[in-house]
Amino acid sequence: MFKFMIQCCCFSLLCIQAVSQHQTVKATGVFNGIYSEPLFLSTSKSDIEKTQFHYSFQSLYLKGKSSIRQTSTLKNQKMWKKLSNGSPGETNGQANKITAITPSIGNNFKGNELKTWTPTDNAIAISNGGIIVSCVNYGVEYYLSNGTPLLQNFTWNDFVNNALLDQGKFDPRVIYDNQHDRFIIVLLHGFSSTTSKILVCFSKTNNPMDGWNIYQMSGNPYQEGAWSDYPTIGVNNDELFINCNRFGNAPNYDFKKTFIYQIGLAEGYAGNALQYGLWNHIYTPDNQDGLTLCPASDGMGNSLSEKMYFVQMMPDSGSFVYLYELQGKLSSPNKTFTASQYAIPHFEVCANALQKDPSTGFLDSLSTGNAWVQNAFYLNNTIHFISDADIGNGWCGIQYGRIYLDSAKAVVTQFGDQGTDLAYPAIASFAHDISDAGVVIAYTQSDSTITPQCGVISVDDGMNWSSLQTVKTGDTVVNILYPPNYAIQPERWGDYTGICRKYNATQPEAWMGAAYGANTPPRLASYGTWIAQLISNEPASLLTTKQEEFSINMYPNPATDMFTLEFDNTQAGIVKVFLRNAEGKLVKLLLNDYLRVSKNTVMFNKLALPNGVYFVEIQMGDQQLISQKLIINH
């Protein structure tokens, strides 16, 4: 095994970024299992292609997610602050450092329509073969990447088509499993402890038109008068992970705790009885309840064996990001579940967003939900996560962060402008290779000068933002919960936006599915889904020599027993140190971290390398600063 040691003298802050070391790692969670769940339903191509009734049932109710902790109180206070500070829709000129390259928008087209009282809850996945599965609360649709529809107007009742599952179906999630070339859909059923189910659906092939193996897992697994809400999902090589929050029955909907299903993939793809376990009693290191844990699958679809990471932030406010690590397969007798916390700048939930009817001038609001993590991914010992947060005076902006596992630090940066609201961001890797930390972010946007729309922004390897780019402007305001039938209240929005990397694309590529204001007959002033291909314009490497920013000393060379690299950097930022062979192939990423102006030392055991010529490269952001030859001679 290649052994190395990194010594860095100091760390600091980067403008709107913050770096900190994590606190004590603490064991948490109680595992129950292993259990078995038989196949509930198997659908086929003929089931999908036959004429459907297109029935959909939705229940308008107030779950009160914003009542968790102090979320509702803070949001109400911030709305008054927002309205009393300047004219809504007039940006204050707040500067964001714009140096990253804006993505290109490729194929894009209209997707699912929303014909219910709910928010869209967009979820999207694309296979290596270019088949898109797009989900909203109303139903599911399939497309080719050129926009050709394979399946449209397919409600969730059409998809399940079983009389035993006759309650409302909601909160869909979909993921493409790159290791097995299959899709997985997770869908919730029922709003009470007696009807709550988690429907877990595995595509039979890489073509979703060939049908699904569908399992019904309990949404009240602990028999405590609870039902499950707001799922998040992720996969590793062997297993599917589903996190849900449990709430009590009406009318209080009191929070009951969060929990995780750990489910074997092989049985689901084969249509055999599922093997699964449950994790409960999950707490942060500072003894707060676990809540909405976002699994972090590998961001490039690479192998992730016998572990899964989960990221949490509090829904109302906080000064920590929490990371959970589950080690061990379902069958392992030595599974562990640990929690750690990383200090970040204090964040708070933002106020609800604004929208203005251009024909009447009526000012209405859109719910911006909570400040918890929207989604996350893992890549090369770094966890990437995204949320929205108050960027000032109650306005919503995007909050993006990284947790560097090697150095146990978190870095957070925000983007936004007071006068407009950016909400429900979703993140995907935009990397050229595993050493690249660039990301692409889809978002929704609204203010008093525009109708609800969606867009895209990127952050490069050095944590520089691109400019905002609108993908689809709104066609109309949203007015689903209209008076006099319902009291004036924030229109539902979100609860999440869909994004998925296309894993086999030659140039970094992702696909988004996001909500915009649209007329969806017979209903007007609702939401449509816009599906878009996002293509990176960042070159694989930007070779700009700036050796004046570094001084370097390597010894001994030729190397004998231990190799030592000393370097001084005169500019703070994210620094990477690569070890490459004579052909330029990556042998080892020695460092990927934020460094202040400092003197640094990297050491490793040269006995781990065969004799030959190597190159040590130092890179800051996208710029290669040093490339130094190293000779290994045992």
Predicted regions and their residues:
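Secreted/luminal cysteine- and crosslink-motif detector
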Residues: 9-11, 16, 295, 351
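Terminal low-complexity, poorly structured segments
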Residues: 7-10, 35, 56-58, 70, ...
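N-terminal secretory signal peptides that target proteins for export/translocation
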Residues: 1-2
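C-terminal outer-membrane/trafficking sorting elements
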Residues: 5-8, 15-19, 545-555, 559-634
